[in-house]
């Protein structure tokens, strides 16, 4: 199928983006603004916007757990891009309150305001891991292994239950990387420092997608009739070991490094200690990728998915391969002063 160019697309406007100050949300907001879409940014009052707002952006202070703030933000909105969620919580309830019940409130407010379309950006974690047999696809029965994945799946089910009110599309991206990303950035930082610490065996195969390609997929999903009521995986179509990724990062940085493999049991102990301190103090001392919940995702064969359905039905064609994407990301990190 021939891809519909973004320049030929009639964009729905105004749009509301939840999680607009986040990594993917910020890139989506900027892409919409470039297309002269009026964008409402739902952010908390304490949040920092990682880019300079333009005249066609409106900042709406609120929270996905606050129905009244959602109702107010959605007045006059035609399309909702729901990206808000939490990657790290203290228990199952904390994940559910945002990823599931927050999604319910977003969908309810959208229905009350008679929006025309909703795209829910979920996660590969909602589907569960791939196996030794290879990448999973949309026919695979979801078997999430973490609280994060379980509650994102709950969010998917809630969003799709509102399709009688407006068309809904669910996207499940693999690992997303690019400028301003802060979790996978830890690997870039380790390579830059010359020491890469890996917990357990480097045997998992993982699907990645560059942030600009994910934004393209989100916009395609929001403006395609074929996407209504459907779920799609989003990736660059390949899968990689973490060793491959660190090698590409080393090449982009022109840095040599040493890899230190720690027993998974030790990493789990560190993650548990970090969770305990976070629950006690309310402050996290470890990055989100090092948590007890994420350790559940580290003990499976892989996180690889196919993008065949997205390509065939919506004409999705990723523009940025892994090496080029990592090079772009390194350049952005250096420009921002995050790494040398």
Q: What are the residue ranges of the model-derived segments?
A:
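Amphipathic terminal alpha-helices
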Residues: 2-3, 305, 309-313, 317-340
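N-terminal Rossmann NAD(P)H-binding glycine-rich loop of SDR-like oxidoreductase domains
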Residues: 15-35
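NAD(P)H-binding glycine-rich loop region in Rossmannoid oxidoreductase-like domains
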Residues: 61-101, 109, 124-129
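Catalytic helix-loop patch of NAD(P)-dependent Rossmann-fold dehydrogenases
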Residues: 97, 131-176, 196-200
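Conserved Rossmann-fold NAD(P)-dependent oxidoreductase catalytic core, especially the SDR/UDP-sugar
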Residues: 101-147, 169
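Substrate-positioning beta->alpha
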Residues: 150, 154, 181-186, 200-222, ...
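Conserved C-terminal active-site "lid" loop/helix of NAD(P)H-dependent oxidoreductases
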Residues: 211, 247, 270-279, 285-316
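Mid/C-terminal beta-alpha module of Rossmann-like enzyme folds, strongest
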Residues: 220, 224-289, 327-328, 340
């Amino acid at each position: 199928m021939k891809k519909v160019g973004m320049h030929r697309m009639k964009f729905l406007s105004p749009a509301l983006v939840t999680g607009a100050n986040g990594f993917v949300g910020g890139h989506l907001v900027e892409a919409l603004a470039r297309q002269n879409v009026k964008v409402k940014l739902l952010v908390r009052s304490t949040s920092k916007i990682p880019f300079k707002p333009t005249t066609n952006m409106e900042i709406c202070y609120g929270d996905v757990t606050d129905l009244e703030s959602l109702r107010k933000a959605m007045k006059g909105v035609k399309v909702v891009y729901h990206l808000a969620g939490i990657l790290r919580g203290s228990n199952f309830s904390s994940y559910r309150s945002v990823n599931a019940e927050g999604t319910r409130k977003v969908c309810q407010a959208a229905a009350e305001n008679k929006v025309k379309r909703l795209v829910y950006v979920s996660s590969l974690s909602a589907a569960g891991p791939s196996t030794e047999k290879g990448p999973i696809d949309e026919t695979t029965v979801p078997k999430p292994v973490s609280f994060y994945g379980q509650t994102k799946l709950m969010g998917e089910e809630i969003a799709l239950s509102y399709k009688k009110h407006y068309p809904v599309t669910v996207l499940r991206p693999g690992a997303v990387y690019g400028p301003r990303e802060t979790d996978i950035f830890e690997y870039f930082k380790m390579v830059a420092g010359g020491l890469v610490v890996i917990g357990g065996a480097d045997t998992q195969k993982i699907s990645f997608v560059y942030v600009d390609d994910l934004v393209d997929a989100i916009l395609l999903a929001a403006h395609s009739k074929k996407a209504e009521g459907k779920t799609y995986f989003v990736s660059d179509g390949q899968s990689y070991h973490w060793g491959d990724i660190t090698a590409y990062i080393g090449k982009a940085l022109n840095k040599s490094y040493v890899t230190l493999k720690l027993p998974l049991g030790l990493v789990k102990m560190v993650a548990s200690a970090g969770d305990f301190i976070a629950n006690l103090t309310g402050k996290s001392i470890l990055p989100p990728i090092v948590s007890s919940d994420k350790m559940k995702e580290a003990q499976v064969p892989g996180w690889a998915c196919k993008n065949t359905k997205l390509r065939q039905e919506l004409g999705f064609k990723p523009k940025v391969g892994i090496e080029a994407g990592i090079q772009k990301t390194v350049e952005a990190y250096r420009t921002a002063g995050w790494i040398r």
